[in-house]
C-alpha cells in the first residue's frame, strides 16, 4: 500500500487532511510537533485523532523553536490578540514553522519510502501566513525534488495541500462528507488544558464563520458562551 506522512496539529484543517489521505487509500503516518505552543491541548487532540483514524504510526517531535520567541503562540511576553480581520501578517505567525515541519516530514517520508506528504495549509479564510500560500507549496516541492535521494532518482516525494484553494466552509463540508468528527479537534490559539476555545481569536472566528457558512452545527466547546 502507498504510504503518506500527514502533518496533524489537532486542528480542523489537518484533521480534514488526514481524512482525505485515508480516503485516497494511503497507509497513513501522522506527524505532530510540540514546538512550545501555549495551546498545548491541541497535541492531546492530535493523539486522539491519530488513534481514531487508526494511523500506522503517530510521532510527536519536540522542537525548541518556541525558545526563540517572535510569535504570540509561543512567547509568553506576547498576548494572542482577538480577531483583527486585517490583511497584515499577524503576531500569531510562527517564523518559518511550516518550512521546519515540512523539512522533518520530508526526512521521515524518505525513510519510510512514502510517496506523499499532506499538509492542511489553506490560502482561503486563513490568517495571512506566508507559508500557507500555493507558491510556497510549489517552492517546497522544488526543494524536495532537489534535496532528496528519491528526488534525484526521479521518484520525488509529492507535497500535497488538498485544502489550499478551499474556504473554511468547503473544508468543513469535505470533512463532514468523509465522516470527520470535528468535536475532537482543537483550533483555538488560546485553548485551555481541556481544549475549550476562547471564541475570539483569529482561529476561533474563522472556524465559527466556516461552520455558519457550511450550515453545519458547530460542535466547538467554549470557555464562556460566545
UniProtKB/Swiss-Prot annotation:
Keyword ATP-binding: yes
Pathway: Purine metabolism; 7-cyano-7-deazaguanine biosynthesis
EC numbers: 6.3.4.20
Cofactor-binding details, from the entry: Binds 1 zinc ion per subunit.
Keyword Magnesium attributed: no
Catalyses which reaction(s): 7-carboxy-7-deazaguanine + NH4(+) + ATP = 7-cyano-7-deazaguanine + ADP + phosphate + H2O + H(+)
Annotated family: Belongs to the QueC family.
Protein name, per record: 7-cyano-7-deazaguanine synthase
Organism: Coxiella burnetii (strain RSA 331 / Henzerling II)
Lineage: Bacteria, Pseudomonadati, Pseudomonadota, Gammaproteobacteria, Legionellales
Amino acid at each position: 500500500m502507498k504510504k503518506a506522512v500527514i502533518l496533524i496539529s489537532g486542528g480542523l484543517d489537518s484533521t480534514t487532511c488526514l481524512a482525505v489521505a485515508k480516503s485516497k487509500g494511503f497507509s497513513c503516518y501522522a506527524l505532530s510537533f510540540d514546538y512550545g505552543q501555549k495551546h498545548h491541548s491541541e497535541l492531546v487532540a492530535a493523539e486522539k485523532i491519530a488513534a481514531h483514524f487508526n494511523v500506522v504510526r503517530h510521532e510527536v517531535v519536540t522542537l525548541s523553536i518556541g525558545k526563540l520567541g517572535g510569535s504570540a503562540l509561543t512567547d509568553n511576553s506576547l498576548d494572542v490578540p482577538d480577531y483583527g480581520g486585517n490583511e497584515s501578517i499577524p503576531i500569531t505567525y510562527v517564523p518559518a514553522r511550516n518550512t521546519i515541519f515540512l523539512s522533518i516530514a520530508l526526512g521521515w517520508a524518505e525513510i519510510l519510502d512514502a510517496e506523499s506528504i499532506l499538509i492542511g495549509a489553506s490560502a482561503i479564510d486563513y490568517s495571512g501566513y506566508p507559508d500557507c500560500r500555493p507558491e510556497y507549496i510549489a517552492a517546497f516541492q522544488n526543494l524536495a525534488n532537489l534535496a532528496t535521494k528519491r528526488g534525484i532518482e526521479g521518484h520525488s516525494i509529492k507535497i500535497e495541500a488538498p485544502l489550499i484553494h478551499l474556504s473554511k466552509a468547503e473544508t468543513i463540508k469535505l470533512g463532514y462528507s468523509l465522516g470527520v468528527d470535528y468535536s475532537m479537534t482543537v483550533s483555538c490559539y488560546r485553548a485551555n488544558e481541556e481544549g475549550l476555545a476562547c471564541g475570539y481569536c483569529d482561529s476561533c472566528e474563522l472556524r465559527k464563520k466556516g461552520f455558519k457558512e457550511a450550515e453545519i452545527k458547530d460542535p466547538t466547546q467554549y470557555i464562556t458562551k460566545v
